[in-house]
Amino acid sequence: MRATLRILCALTFLVSCSRGARVVSGQTVCQGNPEHPCYKIAYFKDVSSRVAFWEALQACEMDGGSLLSIENTAEQKHIEHLLRELSVSSSTGPASITDGDFWIGLTREEGDNAQEPGAFASCPNLYRWTDGSVSLFRNWYADEPSCGGEACVVMYHQPTALAGPGGPYLYQWNDDRCNMKHNFICKYEPESHLVKVQSDRPGGHDVDLSTEDKEDRRTPPTDEDESPRLIIAGPSSMLLIYVIIPTIPLLLLILVASGTCCFQMLSKSKPRTKTSVNQSTLWISKTPKIDSGMEV
């Protein structure tokens, strides 16, 4: 859970530090047609910040989306275009993108027949999309999936890698161990579906879709060779919540420490009881005694 919150916080930081026309890590990207889904690419240049498959899945779901499913060749090409446009922007300009594969929402379901004879041959048919999509589109590299202990799927993104026996690795799919650390891509429902869901609710027919960051609606290009125009949506307001949540343990620690200090200070300032001394019991009396037996 904490790892997922750190991911969302990192994405929020990247979005808050970057505003530009290109595709930016942590920013929601939508096409001009509201019937098309939106995407969010989570790219971490620092390898130690990358996450395992199930952490990526949880991060997307907590943000209202799902780990990427790819329905057809057109969507595969669109994701490739987004990755080519990817940049991690800073105040001085875009930084270089290093090698790093991306988790997609395809994983192998281990059934009762996994150990039966011939199960290895049917292994590619055991892969399912985590968002419930029934699409059979696959973009495996030549000798993939290798199956075995590798049950989760990544999209190759290693621009510096040389082509292998099956051709270039870039954007092809590979099965990997689910605990490996990679980048990931989230996918969100089309805007028209979200509007329909809201309008179906009681009192939801007059839905105001205007926001502070209004999207620039553009007509999708008709030329297949032309790069698709993109719309960069504002960062999800829900991500801001996860900036506050991780600070709760720190606030509790400060509160406990403050209480402990106050308790110690009060203990030191408490007056101590002193034993009263009865002056009459002192062996030296201030009033001298008169010896009645002395005669002058």
Curated annotation (Swiss-Prot):
The chain crosses the membrane at residues 239-266. Residues 197-229 are annotated as: Disordered. Residues 38-187 form the C-type lectin domain. Residues 197-221 have a biased composition (Basic and acidic residues). Plays a role in the development of the nervous system such as in neurite outgrowth and elongation. Involved in motor axon growth and guidance. Required for correct interactions of motor axons with the horizontal myoseptum. Overexpression partially rescues the motor axon defects upon Smn-depleted. This is Chondrolectin.
